[in-house]
A protein has these predicted regions:
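The serine-hydrolase catalytic nucleophile loop
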Residues: 41-54
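Conserved alpha/beta-hydrolase
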Residues: 54-75
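Short beta-strand/loop motif that positions the catalytic acidic residue
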Residues: 185, 191-193, 197
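Catalytic histidine-centered segment of alpha/beta-hydrolase-like enzymes
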Residues: 225-236
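Catalytic nucleophile-loop/oxyanion-hole region of alpha/beta-hydrolase
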Residues: 69-96
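Conserved alpha/beta-hydrolase "acid-adjacent" motif
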Residues: 198-204
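An N-terminal hydrophobic leader/cap segment in hydrolases
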Residues: 1-15, 20-26
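Hydrolase active-site cap/lid region
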Residues: 119-171
């Protein structure tokens, strides 16, 4: 159900199995279901896009948004998906203890981490993947292209950008391949992509959808849409309505 109550925002930290401190915010509005928002690279829980999105989702669910390692108020260095699944484990454990249903929404590299988690665990009720890559190696050369980097610069927030810390050595590690891991996920899954995404081209969405073994799956291509959180920023209420409508289906 929808509520007009403004969410109370509570800050917290959890410790990962490899001793990284992960910062998170809980938007509490007395719902018994929760949405977890998993951001991509160069985003944080306090970036304008995700704080606004969390407020909007909190009309329908409680919301948890975290900073992956090397981002925002979390410690450690970002490893481009190599270790970030450890960041989300204690967040989901917290959610399972406190809510009737847990939904996970991953954006860009956050969707890669979400696929990695859900392929190995069965304690998430529904999964939404926004601008998910089939394979990290298929996107890394697109990130610094003008079409990709200019929209990122438009969202420039000094405090956020200067908080990012990453491990260059992690780029050499074996990376997660969602196209393989999606075959282990049976829960309801929604795949969302932008028609004009300059980083993760729309064919990634189609390939992941086709490879999915979920009996309850749907793929949505947003006309003229761009990348990840931009799909929300370009049409906030439409994006929220799309997600809420799908999550509320039995």
């Amino acid at each position: 159900f929808q509520t007009s109550i403004r969410a109370e925002v509570l800050e917290g930290h959890v410790q990962t199995s490899d001793n990284v401190s992960i910062a998170y915010d809980v938007y509490k509005a007395s719902h018994d279901e929760v949405v977890i928002l998993a951001h991509g690279w160069f985003m944080t829980k306090n970036s304008n896009a995700f704080s606004q999105m969390a407020e909007d989702f909190s009309k329908y669910y409680d919301v948890i948004v975290l900073d992956f390692r090397g981002h925002g108020k979390s410690s450690g260095k970002y490893t481009f998906g190599s270790k970030e699944v450890e960041d989300i484990k204690p967040i989901i454990n917290y959610a399972k203890r406190n809510y009737k249903k847990v939904y996970l929404i991953g954006f860009s590299l956050g969707s890669l981490i979400s696929v990695d988690y859900c392929s190995k665990n069965n304690n998430v009720d529904k999964l939404i993947l926004v601008s998910a890559p089939t394979d990290f190696d298929k996107i890394e050369n697109n990130v610094l292209s003008p079409n990709a980097f200019v929209p990122t610069l438009r969202k420039f927030e000094y405090k956020r950008w200067t908080s990012i810390r990453f491990s260059l050595s992690a780029l050499k590690r074996n990376k997660i391949k969602p196209i393989n891991e999606i075959k282990n996920i049976k829960i309801p899954t929604l795949f969302i992509a932008g028609e004009n995404d300059p980083i993760i081209y729309k064919w990634h969405n189609s390939m992941l959808y086709d490879a999915s073994i979920s009996e309850n799956k749907q793929a949505i291509l947003i006309k003229k849409g761009k990348h990840a959180e931009d799909l929300y920023l370009e049409a906030p209420q439409t994006f929220i309505d799309t997600c809420v409508s799908w999550l509320n289906k039995s």
